[in-house]
Amino acid sequence: MALYQSKTITVNKPFEEVYGKVSDLRNLEQFRDRIPKEYTVNFKCDTDYVQFRVAPVGDLLLRIVERGADKIRLNVEKLPFKAEISMNIGNVSPSETNIQLVLDADIPFFVKHIVGNKLEEGMDKMADILTLSLNSL
């Protein structure tokens, strides 16, 4: 398995507020206008999943499989390999919360060198979207 980590982002909101927003994926609908247009094709969300298109991969489905005290785990479905994203959420102060996204993917060796940098960039892009969206609440 290969690990790809986003940069750690800081949200200027209390932990409870941030956790409440990211643990229910229906809340992504509020941020839809802040999500780059290329990721809103086939966009659907519900409490436990979000689906969207990523070129050239196709439709992806992220499904929450665990809600922990400071972590939310999501399976990445509709890929030709097993992958999971952990959203690590930390209380920094009464008004600040840190989030880091970690992708754990079972990428075939011959593909890893081709897509590795793109996956890392994708994790950072997701973190940037979260920062903009959550800070604007």
What is the meaning of each model-derived region?
Residues 77-128, 132:
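Beta-strand/loop substructures that line and gate deep hydrophobic ligand-binding cavities in soluble
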Residues 12-15, 65-68, 88-98:
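A short, structured loop/turn motif at beta-sheet edges
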Residues 1-44:
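Hydrophobic ligand-binding cavity/cleft-lining segments
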Residues 2, 6-8, 69, 80-86:
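Soluble, non-transmembrane catalytic domains of enzymes that act on hydrophobic metabolites at membranes
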Residues 29-30, 39-80, 136:
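Glycine-rich portal/gate segments that line the openings of hydrophobic small-molecule binding cavities
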Residues 6-8, 49-51, 61, 73-75, ...:
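Beta-strand secondary-structure signal
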Residues 17-19, 30, 60-62, 72, ...:
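Short acidic, gly/pro-rich beta-turn/loop elements at beta-sheet edges
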Residues 35-36, 40, 128-137:
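Short, highly charged C-terminal tails/helix-capping segments
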